[in-house]
């Protein structure tokens, strides 16, 4: 039986905060939003980036009422998402071209976020998000195993004299999570 939770947050800050908290506790977590939501989330995005918490943000780019325009298709959030937060951040961004690629690349977004312990932006637009598309039937690979990144088991943790969350044990600049 699948175990998951869907939560309707009261605002963008709560949404990203819950996603980061869920990820910090071992769940694969994401939040959907659009550009104005990314603006509001940027402080939490920086927190996830600097504390190395994997989280996926699905961004349906569009101009809209909060930007003073009627909703329309745009790719207007590229710079915002590439550098969201304060300080020297550079975020991983994925760009699906159609709903079939959204289906395939969403899995990759979670694998990348966990492998590199960082926020990943999944950049769609209003056209993909709202319009009808004709695509081939989607096929899920039942043999798929999530790439959870570098995680220590309870036995691994017991064998260590001391655990340091950000210690680079393998020299690849990626620390182990618990």
Which residues fall in each region the model found?
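Class I SAM-dependent methyltransferase SAM-binding "motif I" and its flanking Rossmann-like core
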Residues: 90
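Flexible, low-complexity linker and terminal segments
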Residues: 105-178
